[in-house]
């Protein structure tokens, strides 16, 4: 571009010189001088330029170590020299230096960008001539080495590859000339390559390790080492969620879920009801997301829960886990049907059937027990059925719902009224009380009678024993000397307890004991012990039947049969009027 502009300016000067005589006439002296100078310049431009030569002190140099010196050889005078590099006008920098006449170009510190072709261009008037081309080769490198894997993913200082994939290794290092490669592999069974690339088919865990490549430049005598660490990722399999086997109770326990997997270099994600789980105050994750803790269990925390393990090449999710959270029982409800409303009072007809249902929300299912206020019987089951209502079925029925896992229980009651009962002045309870009272009174009466009878019998026996003793010692006052004829008419009495009329009592001669000393009347020994004593034994009283024979009985007899027939003691009983 510079040379083209230079030639354009020369032609402009010539055209202006040709036009000036026709448009403007200077003084004669000036015109003469101008014509003389123009003729002189024209003669000079027409003089041919000698051939140019370009030389360089060395065509091959080492970067940062050597310098390059170019020399433009020409004998022409009054010339202008321009330097051209790689077909472009050379732009000097701090590493380049020109001589005073511009014939010498020196590159003090050679860089790789200084490589290429160089020439010098000489301009003499309107004539331009170029020198020959000189090439400069700059040897450099190798630069820092980088090992690339086309099927891997960088994770920090590690490159991860999927198990079973084909992996291509490629070394990137700037160097001139082409360097030599020496590989150092983690496995001895891999043949070390001699180029900058090599391939492993179906990579496995055995191929993990450090891969090193030494790149050497034989010209610059420089070497650099490249290193890459390779990890082989397994294709992940589905994990499992582990949780405690203890019973989970609402508001009473917390639970920790663990995502169990055999893979080490994997990430873990949690899902709740198919959506990514968001941690909260009640849902907390460990540092590596391996465990999920649920604080203060609620009945809505049943899930399902899933955990997913993944790497950049594969992923797998666990089977959904649904928790069993025990709670309840909640409020107990008593109804007359499976889908009817809650009742507190029920009126039912006599002899009709009645079915009551007891229900309460509970996990596990609650246990139900029915009780009646007038009975100690306990019935199990959610349903209570009465086929025919009677009077005794009236009253309050209570249903108790209990949960054996949570240890909680609740109850509810309903009043059952039987309509159509027969009117009665007393209730069944009152009647039962009266019957029981009567039985108790009868028992008391029997006991009292037995007690009185026993007391009287004992008293009678003691009296009889006393009278018998007296009869053996004191003669009775009313012993009659009866004839045999009189003994056939009525029995003889030992004691006469019948009161006598006053006149008869006064007129009758009473037998009395003698006034002698008692020692003269009583004997110290019984008659049996002294048979020859002064006293004679008493005559034996003939035994008479209690009652005379039937047909021959005297109807006006004043004697009746005694109660105690076992005793031979009789008394006279005054007949009633």
Swiss-Prot record:
Matching PROSITE patterns, A to Z?
IG_LIKE
Extract the signal peptide range: 1-30
Q: Which residues lie on this side of the membrane: Cytoplasmic?
A: 452-577
Location comes to: Cell projection, Microvillus membrane; Apical cell membrane
Function noted in UniProt: Together with the tyrosine-protein kinase SYK, enhances production of the cytokine CXCL8/IL-8 via the NFKB pathway and may thus have a role in the intestinal immune response.
Residues modified by carbohydrate are 78, 102, 289
Provide the taxonomic classification.
Eukaryota, Metazoa, Chordata, Craniata, Vertebrata
Where, in residue ranges, is this chain on the Extracellular side? 31-430
Question: What assembly does the database describe for this protein?
Answer: Interacts (via extracellular domain) with PTPRH (via extracellular domain); the interaction dephosphorylates CEACAM20. Interacts (phosphorylated form) with SYK (via SH2 domains); the interaction further enhances CEACAM20 phosphorylation.
This protein's source sits in the domain of life called Eukaryota
> Which GO BP terms apply?
immune system process; positive regulation of cytokine production; response to bacterium
Q: How is it modified after translation?
A: Phosphorylated on tyrosine residues by SYK, SRC and FYN in vitro.
Q: Report the protein name in the record.
A: Cell adhesion molecule CEACAM20
Species of provenance: Mus musculus
Q: Where is the composition biased (Basic and acidic residues)?
A: 516-526
Q: Where is the composition biased (Pro residues)?
A: 536-551
Sites of Phosphotyrosine modification: 559, 570
**Listed CDD domains:** Ig
Q: What is its main location?
A: membrane
Q: Where are the transmembrane segments?
A: 431-451
Coiled-coil spans are: none
Q: Does the keyword Membrane apply?
A: yes
């Amino acid at each position: 571009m510079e040379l083209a502009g230079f030639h354009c300016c020369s032609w402009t000067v010539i055209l202006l010189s040709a036009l000036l005589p026709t448009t403007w006439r200077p003084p004669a002296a000036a015109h003469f001088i101008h014509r003389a100078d123009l003729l002189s310049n024209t003669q000079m431009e027409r003089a041919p330029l000698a051939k140019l030569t370009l030389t360089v002190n060395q065509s091959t140099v080492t970067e940062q170590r050597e310098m390059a010196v170019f020399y433009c050889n020409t004998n022409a005078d009054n010339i202008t020299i321009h330097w051209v590099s790689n077909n472009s006008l050379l732009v000097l920098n701090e590493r380049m230096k020109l001589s005073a006449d511009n014939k010498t170009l020196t590159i003090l510190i050679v860089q790789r960008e200084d490589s290429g072709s160089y020439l010098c261009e000489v301009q003499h008037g309107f004539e331009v001539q170029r020198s020959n081309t000189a090439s400069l080769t700059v040897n450099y490198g190798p630069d820092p080495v980088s090992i690339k894997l086309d099927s891997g993913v960088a994770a920090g200082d590690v490159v991860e590859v999927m198990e079973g994939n084909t992996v291509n290794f490629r070394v990137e290092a700037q160097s001139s000339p082409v360097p030599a490669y020496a590989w150092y592999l983690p496995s001895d069974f891999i043949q070390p390559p001699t180029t900058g690339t090599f391939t492993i088919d179906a990579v496995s865990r055995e191929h993990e390790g450090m891969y090193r490549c030494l790149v050497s430049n034989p010209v610059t005598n420089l070497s650099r080492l490249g290193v890459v660490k390779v990890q082989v990722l397994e294709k992940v399999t589905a994990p499992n969620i582990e949780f405690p086997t203890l019973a989970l109770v609402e508001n009473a326990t917390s639970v920790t879920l663990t995502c169990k997997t055999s893979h080490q270099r994997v990430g873990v994600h949690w899902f709740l009801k198919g959506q990514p789980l968001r941690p909260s105050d009640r849902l907390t994750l460990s540092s590596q997301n391996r465990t999920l803790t649920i604080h203060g269990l609620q009945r809505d925390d049943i899930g399902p829960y899933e955990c997913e393990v993944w790497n950049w090449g594969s992923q797998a999710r666990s089977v959904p886990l649904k928790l069993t959270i025990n709670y309840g029982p909640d409020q107990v409800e008593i109804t007359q049907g499976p889908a009817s409303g809650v009742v507190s009072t029920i009126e039912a007809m006599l002899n009709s059937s009645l079915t009551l249902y007891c229900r309460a929300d509970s996990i596990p299912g609650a246990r139900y027990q029915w009780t009646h206020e007038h009975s100690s019987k306990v019935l199990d089951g959610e349903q209570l059925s009465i086929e025919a209502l009677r009077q005794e079925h009236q009253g309050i029925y209570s249903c108790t719902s209990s949960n054996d896992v949570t240890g909680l229980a609740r109850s509810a009651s309903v009043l059952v009224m039987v309509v159509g009962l027969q009117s009665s002045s007393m209730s069944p309870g009152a009647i039962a009380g009266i019957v029981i009272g009567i039985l108790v009174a009868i028992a008391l009466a029997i006991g009292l009678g037995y007690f009185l009878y026993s007391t009287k019998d004992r008293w009678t026996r003691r009296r009889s024993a006393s009278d018998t003793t007296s009869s053996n010692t004191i003669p009775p006052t009313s012993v009659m000397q009866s004839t045999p004829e009189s003994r056939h008419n009525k029995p003889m009495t030992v004691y006469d307890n019948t009161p006598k009329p006053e006149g008869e009592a006064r007129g009758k001669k009473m037998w009395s004991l003698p006034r002698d000393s008692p020692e003269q009347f009583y004997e110290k020994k019984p008659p049996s012990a002294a048979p020859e004593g002064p006293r004679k034994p008493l005559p034996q009283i003939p035994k008479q039947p209690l009652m005379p024979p039937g047909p021959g009985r005297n109807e006006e007899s004043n004697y009746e049969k005694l109660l105690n027939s076992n005793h031979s003691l009789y008394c006279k009983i005054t007949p009633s009027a």
